[in-house]
Amino acid sequence: MTAFSLADLDRIVRSRAAASPDQSYTAKLVAAGPAKPAKKLGEEAVEAAIAAVQGDRAGLVSEAADVLYHLLVVLVGSGVALEDVMAELERRTAQGGLAEKASRGRP
């Protein structure tokens, strides 16, 4: 397993988002406003789902990496810290999945 973490990627995305849009694809996405990176996230998520359904392991790995990257870009552009998402995941995993889902009041 690699030592590279989601927190590492988050630091890279945040650093690149602060760069000039002329110098950084990440900065260009963030500068475009929330719709552009959100659209890219959706596209990559669909591609990941298709790869999973098709049993394309290599494709799924690649698309999952794209999903994680674009999710972090959306978070950065929306002013949401990865730590907030991780805290929410930690809160949710403190109880069983079905109990946690029921506590949200959604099916």
Curated annotation (Swiss-Prot):
One of its GO terms (cellular component) is cytoplasm. InterPro entries: HisE (IPR008179), PRib-ATP_PPHydrolase-like (IPR021130). It is found in: Cytoplasm. The keyword Nucleotide-binding applies. GO terms for molecular function: ATP binding; phosphoribosyl-ATP diphosphatase activity. Coiled coil: none annotated. Its EC number is 3.6.1.31. The keyword Nucleotide-binding applies. Keywords: Amino-acid biosynthesis, ATP-binding, Cytoplasm, Histidine biosynthesis, Hydrolase, Nucleotide-binding. NCBIfam families: histidine_hisI, PRK00400.1-5. This is Phosphoribosyl-ATP pyrophosphatase. The gene is hisE.
